[in-house]
Amino acid sequence: MQEGFHHVAFACRDPEATRHFYEDLLGFALTHTEVEGDEKARMKHLFFDVGDGSSMAFFYLEGPGFPSSYPTDISTGMGLPVWVNHVAFKADADRKRQIKATLSDAGVEPLMTVDHDWCQSLYYLDPNG
């Protein structure tokens, strides 16, 4: 029996900016952090509860053996518009208004809004593109 997914994972450029965006602005609790390695080379893995028993996770890699910088915006690396590959969260109208206001107060404006007839979407870029 299919039960959905446990987590999806993406790369991040700045774990603190990522935490701030998802925990402080969107309200997703940081539920688990794994750190492997040492001061020279390490991997940090952050898990955020997205509200249905699933998590969204981010890897931060630094040190020898890892690139000093890496693209985290999946779509543009494939020559596509930045909004093509994305994650969409469910929210009722009141929650959407609240999130839009919170993000706007933090200086984060939607990339675009789309009425798909069967759902309405607000597209934002997180700190990772």
Features from the language model and the residues they span:
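Helix-adjacent hinge/juxtasegments
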Residues: 63-95, 99
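Vicinal oxygen chelate
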Residues: 100-129
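Residues that flank catalytic or metal-binding motifs in active/ligand-binding sites
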Residues: 4, 44, 52-54, 83-85, ...
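Core segments of cupin and vicinal oxygen chelate
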Residues: 11-61
